[in-house]
Amino acid sequence: MCTKCGNPEAIHLPAYSRRSFLKFSGVAALGAAVSRSLFAASDEKPKPQNELTPDEALHRLKQGNQRYIHGVMKRHDFAAERAALAGGQNPYAGILSCADSRIAPEYAFDTGRGDLFVARVAGNFTNEDVIASFEYAVQFLGTPLLVVLGHEKCGAVDAAIKTVKDGAKLPGHLPAMMKKITPAVQDVIGQPGDLLANAIRKNVMLNVEHLKNATPVISKFVEEGKVKVVGGVYRLEDGSVEWI
């Protein structure tokens, strides 16, 4: 018999069980809502011209870079795109770029809004946040191409060289950043040619491979031929991109 109501067949859940149930229900509902919203993003195709194969996407970037180099960039009508892009996005390329203020991927490839999915960090290296961002791009936005874009005279790579060769000490969180870049420096020390240029190229190459293999989400798309991961080095003098 229940001591609370006198009903011999009544079963009352303790308060903590009801709270746990409500909490679980709320989490489940939130998870379902998030999943629906993420999958809904993949259904929005505001720019049909961005539905490309990996090779077509790379060719389009190369064409845009040539226009940028020669100063014949397209006129982008942002006003006409606003309504469509307010409802979703389907970028045809994801770019991991250095945070250097002299590098602007949207300009370098002569693209409009909604064309590029850009992540930027000094030294253009991969980490969990960058990888998760590109997982989202390929899984839910259908992005067919990922590019690791380094650039000549990169200050972050130069600092990594100084920490390796000279034992330079850096303040704050900079040492953690250097740990991401020093493997590239160590791999090219002793090689012929300019150390900084070699380290910049190697840093791009290492991060291309890491992006390909660090996560089963991206690697699956790469293995199926639905996504390509490439690297490039941006030239400050003329704006050209050397593809690696």
Task: Give residue spans per PLM region.
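N-terminal secretory signal peptides
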Residues: 1-16
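Divalent-metal-activated hydrolytic enzyme cores
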Residues: 5, 22-28, 44-88, 114, ...
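N-terminal twin-arginine translocation
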Residues: 15-20, 31-47
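Short beta-strand segments
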Residues: 96-98, 120, 147-151, 230-235
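Active-site cofactor/substrate anionic-group-binding motifs, chiefly glycine-
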Residues: 99-102, 106-124, 129
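Gly/Ser/Thr-rich loops at beta-strand to alpha-helix junctions
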Residues: 101-102, 151-156
